[in-house]
A protein has these predicted regions:
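Intrinsically disordered, charged and Pro/Gly-enriched terminal/linker segments
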Residues: 71, 85, 106-109, 141-281
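A conserved beta-strand->loop->alpha-helix hinge within the catalytic CA
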Residues: 113
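Short amphipathic alpha-helical recognition elements used for nucleic-acid or partner binding
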Residues: 67-101, 121
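Short beta-strand->alpha-helix linker/helix-N-cap micro-motif
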Residues: 90-100, 105-106, 130, 134, ...
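DNA-binding patch around the recognition helix
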Residues: 46-52, 116-147, 263-274
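Juxtamembrane/start-of-transmembrane alpha-helix segments at the extracytoplasmic/lumenal side
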Residues: 1-5
Length: 281
């Protein structure tokens, strides 16, 4: 068993983040290795009291554990997210906030509706411990303290100083794409910036998981990448290789076929690489 593990580690390390020619050990041995060396796929972070989760479906949970997401009307959600996104750079001014959410209203009218909106938002956040909407130095910010939690805030902290092998990041990202149910054009740029940061980190994570023969979480990384870019060639290569290493070649072929069908639909041409090309190169 030791020589199998050593052999895989040496081969994977030589891969160095690019897809070089590589053949896996026969299916029976690889399946045994994967089951003995690694545990299950990392699970998504669960909702908990005093939490605001933005990856996957936006979820707001009170101190009592009640899901209070439905209290956020469209305007309240926009206000919360705009303030939250700007908090990292020092907050957002009243004028800027009004200009983004109520661009057609005169200053006096927008001031009144802004005041009502912010008061209603504070009432909702007051049902959570450790979350405060405050106005400081002329700008609105959202502050999180114990025991409150926000996956967006934690993800930025991790991504700022990222190194592969981070289970916490994968647990956050496993919930789903950032603001996956939100089609508000107001947040398109912000979502794109988060997607870019996530994709860069998860590609490095996938390479690290693969080089350490962590097949299940290599597949998880591939799934995360494909949510961001359904035609990510790196992602489908990782998925095909890792699933085959786990003895799940049928599933690998299903995913490959789905990929090439989507590729054909989007580009009106056949995908150049065969299943075997991805598996062995």
């Amino acid at each position: 068993m030791q020589w199998i593990i050593l052999g895989l580690t040496v081969i994977a390390a030589g891969w160095g983040g690019s897809f070089l020619r590589m053949r896996f050990l026969r299916k029976g041995r690889v399946s045994l290795l994967a089951s003995e060396k690694h545990g299950a796929r990392i699970r998504p972070r669960k909702d908990g009291p005093d939490s605001l989760l933005l990856f996957g479906s936006l979820t707001l949970t009170s101190s009592s554990g009640e899901d209070i997401t439905s209290l956020l009307t469209g305007r309240l959600k926009e206000t919360l997210l705009l303030i939250l996104f700007h908090t990292r750079s020092g907050g957002i001014s009243s004028r800027r906030l009004s200009g983004l959410i109520w661009p057609d209203k005169e200053e006096e009218k927008s001031k009144n509706v802004r005041g009502v909106t912010l008061n209603n938002l504070r009432k909702i956040l007051n049902r959570m411990e450790g979350v405060k909407l405050v106005f400081e130095e002329g700008k609105y910010v959202v502050r999180f303290g114990e025991p409150a939690y926000c996956d967006y805030v934690e993800s930025l902290s991790i991504l700022d100083d990222y190194s592969p092998g981070n289970d916490r990041l994968l647990s956050i990202l496993a919930r789903g794409k950032f603001l996956k149910d939100d089609g508000d054009l107001l947040f398109d740029k912000m979502k794109a910036e988060i997607d870019d940061k996530v994709a860069s980190a998860v590609l490095a994570e996938a390479q690290w998981r693969f080089s350490n023969a962590d097949w299940a979480n290599t597949v998880l990384c591939a799934d995360i990448l494909l949510r961001i870019d359904p035609l990510s060639e790196n992602a489908i290569k990782f998925a095909v290789k890792a699933l085959s290493a786990m003895g799940q070649e049928d599933e690998a072929r299903v995913r490959y076929n789905n990929f090439i069908n989507q590729y054909k639909k989007d580009y009106d041409e056949e995908y150049a690489s065969s299943f075997d090309d991805l598996l062995h190169h």
